[in-house]
Amino acid sequence: MWEKFGHPRKLFFIIDRRLSGNFMKQFCWIFFIVSIILIILGLLGWWAGADHPYKTFIHIFNPQYDFGLNPEILNAEAIGTPSHLQRIIGFIITMIGSLLLTGLLTTTLINWVDRRKERWQSGEARYHITKDFVAIIGTHKMVSNLCNTLLSKGDIPRWIVILGSRDTDEVRKEIFESLIDKNHRKRIVVYKGDRSSKLNITSLNPEKAREIYIIGENFPEDGFDHDTVNLETYYTLSSYIAEKACNDTKRKRIKCHVMFEYQSTFTAFQYFDIDKANCHLLDFIPFNYYENWAQQVLVPDLMSQKPNIYKPLYDTPIDSESKKRVHLIIVGMSKMGVAMAIEAAQVAHFPNFSSRGVRTLITFIDRNAAREMTFFKGRFSNLFEISRHRYVDANQLPSGGYTVEHFYDANPSSPVSKTHKWLDPMNDVDSTSRFKGENLGDKIVDIDWEFIEGDISNPNIRDYLIDAASDPDSVTNLAICLPVTPEAVSAAIYLPEKVLHGSHQILVQQSTTDALVSAIRKGSDAINGHPLMKLVPFGMIDRSNYDTERRDLLAKLINYTYGLGPDEDLSKIYSSGELRLKDVEKSWTEMKGNKGKPLMSMRWSNMYHASAIYYKVGSLGIQEGA
């Protein structure tokens, strides 16, 4: 019987879920349980001497039946008529039995039901789930979409066990409403508890999980300590699993995805192996919500069956003879804005840099660009020791439209400006770059960076946007990365008309829902060729898709290719049918740091390489679907 549930406590989970429904469900379950009890008592009474089971209930107040004195069954002459004392004793015993049945038993049953319901609703109930489950630690706003992603794969888990500090009813409601297949509700188990507590962690039985996701809580619960607590949770989890696995040499390594809210923290853990002692038990996989969205927007998933509303950064593939450059303008150096810039810097590399010296340009526009630039350059100090960049304070420029010098630089190969000079750390005479004079050449970095201080409503910045969108040799993309939804929409729809017409696409961040931008697009659709149709929403919490299996598979193939011998060819191995994913996976799990490089940095190098393949293939003239 228990094979279906795996453990008796799982049966309690099913009972709790049933009893926590509406009144009719509770009534039906109590009626069912009481009926079973009465049927059992009736059968016992029949076995004890009643000629029909129903008489056990009809004569419940007849002391003779309770004492087995029914003259129809027993010999009344031999036994005699019951005395008054016997009748009184029989009546007392019958009444006590009735009180026990109708009072104590019923009250106990109702109290038990109420307690089970309360424990279920509050998330205090715990169930012994040890097989075929995924553990999610934290109830961050992405938990609903993560559940949908896990339940839409081919091999879906039997259970998804969630531990978090938010109200469990609220979490359940969010998840249930977002589930594409409502039949999957029965797979969701929610516990309430602090993720920093080892007791709560152990209640998940994490050593038995298929996968573990540490996503943490929202800002109201975690504040600025989100990343710190998530890392502490990982170490607690790692030490516990190490204790449980001390004598198990055949234990399979568990993937443990750890979310970092801040780009700086996430970037740091992409380059370090933080848990070498237990890396054979837990596969530490850091990820960032905002970078995940940036990949979703900038890196098309060619294997996905869903329609993609996001365009690549170019209009037509850029080959070695093209004069065009890609220009990504990011309004707002928010978490999303920084993630978009980093992802673009990973993928926007084109062959016309080698042949024509054309560089991709990434521009930040922010009210506090000077301060944010300092943080950004400090975070990627090595990059800015070899990359050209400049800072422009649009607030200090005289406004007056085209009567003053515009600071947009249309020369992608050798940007020159009389007033707003570019810093070139590889060639400037006064440069203090460590790499100057290292004979790296001018063709080492093909991306330039701009930091423009000012509001998007500033006339000088609007002139800059017009110039950028009007440049025939520039494919201009705008990303409005303002976290406040109405502000982002307002900034997008009030762009100059020339910008709306001349831009390749205008991405508008929407934190919760795309209703505003979708309504604008729907209204604009009625007017053929309306420029507001170029507005595309992104960043919505209910559309985040943390499904990196296809990208990871490509990264593993790239890593496998690096390990091939001089006489081996991946294309021949693939075409001959000799390529086995087991070997590819083995080369990934057994990868070791090369020449002092951490394993984690090598993995991320392969993953970013995989993300850039779409653009490289496009530059070769290979069309999508070929």
Each language-model region and where it sits:
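Cytosolic regulatory regions of ion transport systems
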Residues: 2-34, 48-57, 62, 68-95, ...
